[in-house]
């Protein structure tokens, strides 16, 4: 992809073998977010861009075959980590808005393509710092006022919302258990700025942030009762956050609880007791 993107951008590589070293060698390296740093490193190495223009920057991004820079997951936590080290960030234009939330003083470059970045560092087309964006929910939450009767159950829901308690509803089909649970987010307090950042960082790692805009609504997750342990607590071949993490600062609704696998339910014990999810994987 790096070679094809450079060729499409009119930035041909020299006619000789080029070796790219990713250090430290003992750490596993996978994913498309290495495309952009490799390409920019090559451009600096052969003199296509000033060799010092990358100093003090963390770089993430995927390359298209036409030289465009595509979005990658995890840009927001990468930006926060880079800012903590005093670095700037070079990332895809589609991710610039979420990266801008890391710090108002942080230097962020979000080019659309390799050519646009080359024009920026040579002074031909200076890039503006991306502005942070907020995505307001397009639909209204189900309202607790819609529920008629069930005063005791509604009171329990209010107590759980006020104190951040877990809640178990038991009753016959049609009693309104699911309807009440789906209305819990409507009585929860708004996300604080710190909570909003936490929720958005998890969404960024999971690749569910839309247009780089932060989420301003508490998450509501309702996995099917056939969900696996990896889907619930996270993991998989390429480890990703599970439903427990995706519902952080929000609601994890397990409808038809007895239908869930006993192993899946038992996997929730540690997160409930410690307040964190730890995934151990070989290699």
Stretch-by-stretch model annotation:
Residues 1-168, 172-179, 280-281:
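Peripheral, non-AAA+ core regions of ATP-driven protein-machinery
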Residues 88, 165, 248-251, 274-277:
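Loop/turn-to-beta-strand initiation segments
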Residues 125-159, 163, 191-244:
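P-loop NTPase nucleotide-binding/switch module
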Residues 46-48, 123, 207, 249, ...:
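Short glycine-centered helix-capping/turn motifs at secondary-structure transition points
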Residues 168-212, 269, 274:
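Walker A/P-loop
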Residues 168-172, 237-244, 257, 274-283:
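Conserved Walker
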Residues 240-273:
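Conserved AAA+/SF3 P-loop NTPase catalytic/coupling segment centered on the Walker-B
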């Amino acid at each position: 992809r790096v070679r094809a993107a450079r060729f499409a951008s009119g930035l041909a590589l020299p006619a000789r073998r080029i070796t790219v070293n990713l250090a430290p060698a003992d750490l596993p390296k996978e994913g498309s977010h290495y495309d952009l740093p490799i390409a920019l490193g090559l451009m600096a190495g052969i003199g296509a861009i000033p060799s010092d223009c990358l100093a003090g920057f963390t770089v993430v991004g995927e390359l298209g075959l036409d030289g465009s820079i595509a979005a990658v997951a995890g840009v927001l936590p990468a930006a926060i980590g880079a800012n903590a080290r005093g670095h700037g960030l070079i990332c895809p234009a589609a991710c610039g808005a979420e990266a801008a939330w890391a710090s108002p003083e942080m230097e962020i470059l979000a080019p659309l393509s390799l050519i646009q970045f080359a024009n920026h560092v040579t002074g031909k087309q200076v890039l503006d710092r991306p502005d942070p964006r907020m995505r307001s929910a397009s639909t209204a939450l189900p309202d607790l006022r819609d529920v008629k009767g069930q005063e005791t159950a509604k009171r329990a829901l209010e107590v759980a919302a006020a104190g951040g308690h877990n809640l178990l509803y038991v009753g016959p089909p049609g009693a309104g258990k699911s309807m009440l649970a789906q209305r819990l987010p409507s009585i929860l307090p708004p996300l604080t700025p710190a909570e909003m950042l936490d929720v958005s960082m998890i969404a960024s790692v999971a690749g569910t942030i839309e247009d780089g805009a932060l989420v301003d609504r508490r998450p509501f997750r309702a996995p099917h009762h056939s969900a696996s342990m990896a889907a619930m607590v996270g993991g998989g071949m390429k480890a990703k956050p599970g439903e427990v993490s995706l519902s952080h600062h929000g609601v994890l609704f397990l409808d038809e609880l007895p239908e869930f696998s006993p192993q899946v339910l038992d996997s929730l014990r540690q997160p409930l007791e410690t307040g964190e999810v730890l995934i151990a994987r070989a290699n």
